[in-house]
C-alpha cells in the first residue's frame, strides 16, 4: 500500500541522513535546534502581549500565551508569508490563546528576527484596531 511505501521511504531517508551526519553530527543538530528555539522564544517574549506559558526545559518547541486570540494573529502572520505556529486552544481548551512555536537548526537568526518583527507589528496593529 502507499502508506507502507511512504513509511519505507521515510525510514530509508532517515537512515541515510543519520549515517551521513553520524552520532556527533546528530548531537550538533540537536544542540543547534535547542539554541535556535531559545533564540526564538527570547525574541518572541520580548513582544508586548506575549509570554512563555511554561518555564520548564524544552527541546525545540515552546508554548506562548498571547493577550488576544491566536487565530487572528496566525491569519495576519500568514498574510505576510509566515507560518506562525499552532493554535492550541481547540485541542487544549484550558490553554486559550496559547501558541505552539518551534525552531530547528534550519532556522537562521534572520528568520527569527523576521518572525519576531512581524509578530510585534501584528500585535501592535491588533491592539490599535
Report the location of each language-model feature.
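Active-site C-terminal subdomain of aminotransferase-like
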Residues: 1-48, 52-55
Amino acid at each position: 500500500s502507499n502508506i507502507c511505501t511512504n513509511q519505507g521511504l521515510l525510514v530509508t531517508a532517515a537512515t541515510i541522513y543519520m549515517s551521513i551526519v553520524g552520532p556527533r553530527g546528530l548531537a550538533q543538530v540537536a544542540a543547534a535546534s535547542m539554541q535556535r528555539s531559545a533564540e526564538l522564544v527570547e525574541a518572541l517574549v520580548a513582544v508586548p502581549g506575549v509570554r512563555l506559558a511554561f518555564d520548564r526545559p524544552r527541546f525545540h518547541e515552546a508554548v506562548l500565551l498571547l493577550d488576544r486570540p491566536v487565530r487572528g494573529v496566525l491569519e495576519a502572520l500568514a498574510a505576510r508569508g509566515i507560518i506562525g505556529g499552532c493554535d492550541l486552544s481547540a485541542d487544549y481548551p484550558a490553554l486559550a490563546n496559547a501558541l505552539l512555536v518551534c525552531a530547528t537548526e534550519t532556522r537562521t537568526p534572520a528568520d527569527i528576527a523576521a518572525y519576531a518583527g512581524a509578530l510585534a507589528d501584528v500585535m501592535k496593529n491588533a491592539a490599535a484596531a
